[in-house]
Amino acid sequence: MFDPTPCIGPYPFRYVPHPDPDALLGVMDREGIARAWVGHLPSAFYRDTGDGNAQLYTTLSQHHARLKPAPTIRPDWPRWEQALDQAMNAGAGALRVYPPQWQMGPDDDRLRTLAIAAGERKLPIILTVRFEDLRQRHPLDTAGDLPGATIRALARAGAGVRLVVVAAGKDLIEEVNWGLTPAEQQRVLWDISWIWGPPEDHLAKLLRTIGAERFVFGTQWPLRLAQSPRANLELLPDDVRGAGLANAELMFANAIA
């Protein structure tokens, strides 16, 4: 099993215990997760993400067989193209981009330029809808949730773009998916970490209507319990239990323009 969602490093708005590679590997062993793309959590809030990316590369260097870096690239920051080349040299599996935290909207050409450049290098972009529910956020955490319009704009940026959207709920997934053409839908994968299981059964409904091939396993560790997505899969109704989820590692191998 593969998880494209975890991060290491501290979270600025509350204490997170042991957000380090050794703890992550222990969680992965317990949950049967073979490999992961790993981001650097505090870099989402940095103006210059270079130091955070450097720390990520160094910290994961001893675990590259299982933990591939997913560095944070800001297209509004000078020399982001060099940061993209550094990501390639470091063996990155994907890139992380945080439009709400950077006050970048759906019409920002810099986001589309980055998405196209990443696609040319066969690097998916990981978008995070939210870190926490709006009701529990710190007063200083003023960024809103990632809007569906931004996801749609990036999915339409080019045939080579690939997106993994983390922490989306049923309403946002339906809004975005049914607003895209069939070809554009194939460029987007959704993780299941924020999709409700019983009694609402949102996950089952989405698997029936959109298809299991558009969803990937995800924990959003260390901000969420890694056991929750596995429990939701085990509690699926019989007609969708055992439906094979996609593997984000194969996004470009299975590319549909």
Each language-model region and where it sits:
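Active-site neighborhood of phospho(di)ester-bond hydrolases with catalytic His/Asp-centered motifs
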Residues: M1-P4, W37-H40, A70-T72, R96, ...
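Active-site gating/metal-coordination segments in enzymes
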Residues: A34, R47-D133
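Catalytic pocket-lining loop regions of alpha/beta-barrel enzymes
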Residues: G93-A94, D107-V216
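Active-site-proximal loop/turn and secondary-structure-junction residues that shape catalytic pockets
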Residues: P42-S43, P75, P99-Q101, F131-D133, ...
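Conserved, mostly hydrophobic/aromatic
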Residues: T5, M28, L56, L60, ...
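Histidine-centered divalent metal-coordination motifs
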Residues: T5-Y11, T128, A167
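Mid-to-C-terminal alpha-helical segments outside catalytic/metal-binding sites
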Residues: F2-C7, H18-R35, T209-V216, L223-A257
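Acidic/histidine-rich helix-loop elements
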Residues: I8-P19, A44
